[in-house]
Amino acid sequence: MRVFGKINIIGLDNGYGNIKTANGIFPASVTCCEAEPAHAQDVLVYDGKYYVIGAGHREFTLDKVGNQDHYLLTLAGIGQELWCNQLTTAAVHLAVGLPLTWVGDQREQFRAYLSQNRHVDFNWRGINYHVDLVGVDVYAQGYSAVIPELRKFTGANMLCDIGNGTMIVMAINDRKPV
């Protein structure tokens, strides 16, 4: 997480196998429970429902917005980052990734999906969080990993992002993705 003024920028990789942030990684699975789970550690409470996060494995689908799973996983990722930075109330701008081949078709849909609530209250691992979601940017997965070193990418280069169900290859010519 990076702080610019009063805005907390959280980078989050919404993978199919795992959700990754700067300070954590957990399996990308969601199980809804009727009552508070007795022994689960990674519990998200949102909209009056209990969700166990990371206790299983999701099936691969081509659409991340078909249900609430990736929204809930994103809330857990936000909670993880805020906890690591000792915050419970924050203005958050998300920087998230989609596979390169999906960015063109799904960028706006995924941005709208993650932006469905400007003000979000939830509980992650027993701590209440209050988030003002001020923005969402969607990037090609893997590209963010090379941005700090982009000045070194002269000539023709290839970036390979291997995920759980995806493998994306991106050409980078003279510091620009093609």
Regions found by a protein language model. Give the residues of each.
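Short, acidic (Asp/Glu-rich) active-site segment that either coordinates a divalent metal cofactor
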Residues: I168-N173
